[in-house]
Amino acid sequence: MNLKQAKELVRGRLSDKRYEHTLNVKKMAVKLAKIYGEDEERAALAALLHDSAKEISKDEMREILRAYPQYAEGGEERPAPVWHGVCAAILARTQWGVTDEAVLSAIACHTAGKPGMTRLDKILYLADMTSVERDWPGVEKLRKLEKKDLDAAMLAALKQTNDFVLSQGKPLDPMSKAAYEDILACSGQNEMEETAESKGL
């Protein structure tokens, strides 16, 4: 699947608002890919498809997860808000001809993260959180940080997401906690956490 095909596909699957968000995420992902030397076309494709299953019903998502347990990554046992990313990756793999494992990984983990995230995984996760229409408190600080230090930005973003989920009284996806701990455990990550905290994130 090329970028034109992906754009046409999601245009037919998403509401105007969600489609606009998708294009904004694509722009941000490409911008970050340029900064960090990631393949821009890969970043663009992952961004275009990341929410392609966002507006299908939970029942449809459940059917997809059950139909492809080998790709479901924990499936129904994980909180429902993360299902759409996993389902989008499954559809991309099984129905839309996407074979690039890096792209599929980024799509699948863009909501919760996971241990061992690749550079592309991190770029899409951050692009989704900081696309131009996002206006949550602290987003401008994260936009600045992500252009300077990808891992410090990921720590800040994961902490922000996890704190928000817990504040809403909702279950935290174990993958999110594991992703945070994994990045923190890498060499030099204590310094990154201090950097994120010093910037108010």
Language-model-detected regions and their locations in the chain:
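N-terminal glycine-rich anion-binding loops that anchor highly charged ligand groups
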Residues: 21
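Charged phosphate-binding loop/patch that engages nucleotide di/tri-phosphates or the phosphate backbone
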Residues: 163-201
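Divalent metal-dependent catalytic cores for phosphoryl transfer on phosphate-bearing substrates
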Residues: 7-12, 30, 35-158
